[in-house]
Amino acid sequence: DGLGYIFTDNGRDWEGDHPYEEVNLLAEGAAYGWPDDDPQHPVPQGTIGPIATWTPHTSLNGIDLRPVNSQLPGLANNPQDGFTLYSSVYGSWNTILPQGQEIVRIDITPAQNNSDGISGQGWDSKVTRFAVDVGTPLPLRFDANGDLYYATFGNDGTLYRITTE
């Protein structure tokens, strides 16, 4: 409650290392800049920018809000202090150096100094690597106990649980 609906946008295929992966906050009737949302230029007039971005061409596949009962690091999940999301990053098959294959933590905080934030929606963000070299992770989910689960593409389809233990 308090943040709204979140969705990811992996950009267009065949754009090389452009554009960035996006985390967007859904707003009714909004335009999100596609296909003119180039990371080297300002958000096109009349559109809404992402509330967070990540390494281009790595595919943010799944995203989930960290529940308040989770022992994993994160914010309080309220409009005053901010929210923490976790996302699986599948990785790129189309780069010289491997990228992705990780889980990232996304802290969404109220924009400071009465600014509109990076998206124009009143939020700022910080994205950090949480777990690396996790294979090619499929969408992740938190369970009712606050533990984080993910599976990987290929191999044996093992389901992994991430806790603080």
Where are these regions (language model features)?
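Conserved loop/turn at the beginning of each blade in beta-propeller domains
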Residues: P56, V132-V134
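Short glycine-rich, acidic/polar surface loops and turns
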Residues: K126, P137-P139
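Hydrophobic residues at beta-strand termini and immediately following loops
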Residues: W34, F130, I162
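Beta-propeller domain segments
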Residues: D1-V127
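Blade-level signature of beta-propeller repeat domains, shared across WD40, Kelch, NHL, RCC1
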Residues: P139-E165
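Short leucine-rich amphipathic alpha-helical surface patches
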Residues: D107-P110, V134, R141-A144
